Amino acid sequence: MKAPPGRRRRAARPPARTHRTTLAFDSTGTARLGIIPRHGRVVTEFADLTQRGASAARIGNRTLTPADLVAVVADCLIADARDDLHDDPAGITLTHPVGYSDQQVGELRAALDAAGLQRVTLVAEPVAAAAWLEAEHGPLMPGLALVYDLGGASLDVTLVRVGAGCPDNPVMGTLRSRDFGGRAFGALMTARAVHGRSGGEPGGSPAPDLAGELRGEHVRESLELVYRCLRLADVTMADVDRVLVVGGAARPAEVARVLGEELARPIVIAADPERTIATGAALMARRAAASAAPAEPVSAARPWVFSRRGARRSARVAAAAAVSAGAIGLTLAVPGDAVFAALSQLGVG
């Protein structure tokens, strides 16, 4: 189907699957994603490699680092997204927080390779978000977009170059604060309710209108992080063409409304902002798979496997072709979000 004259056809929206960011291992060492069994150990709080004291796990005679656990989850999700991925190879992109150091990205890359996932591409979250922006609202003129990622456990503000001619690394500056997000706002609401400042009885739930007012205040207070990010990149708000709002805590209407009023720039937000990054990752994977040349089989060390179908798949991973009829984008939320989202886009073009 062709788009109407003067309008660009939007990219098809990939179907989504979401899971809790938890891993349980049975007696055979097989990983179970997103479940909390009645008996046995559950591993949580491993998703953010920047978090001090992030969980590790010992399975059999192997100790799994947080990066290893992320690779296990990615392997489980890939198996879940496609019934037999390695019989019908697809492009795969896994996003990571933009604030990861080179060492942390290297640890994640090494863990994926050890799990037999050498063809998974790593990309920073705001770069994937910008890919969604280009697909939904492009073609974009060369310029700057500010990605306001309000998640469950933190707020990430990132300046990204968009449009034709942007460099391989389009990120100009980024800052993170754990003082904002779903968890911080929930604590604020609880404090107001406990101290009887909700307009109702002490200990009661805050009234809906006050909840919206508090959320607006929460967003306004976060603007200092936005301005600090602008100063870091040596630009002003006048240099920013649009603000892209993403993240699971960005869904309430007050978030986009307050940002639009205070920043005086066009606000772009998807109907489901928690999916924006994963959708962008899937679109990037599809483009990469469509443009790649067939890969030659390579020999590799036997991968360690913990997913339920890993033994069947790992024998085929080295011979998988790079040209694909589909794509998968994976994004891992920080602990406060507690979800790992996988999206599969079937069909290239």
Regions found by a protein language model. Give the residues of each.
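Gly/Thr-rich phosphate-binding beta-strand-loop-beta motif of the actin/hexokinase/Hsp70
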Residues: 1-15, 19-21, 26, 135-171
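Conserved phosphate-binding catalytic cores of ATP/NTP-utilizing and phosphoryl-transfer enzymes
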Residues: 117-148, 278-290
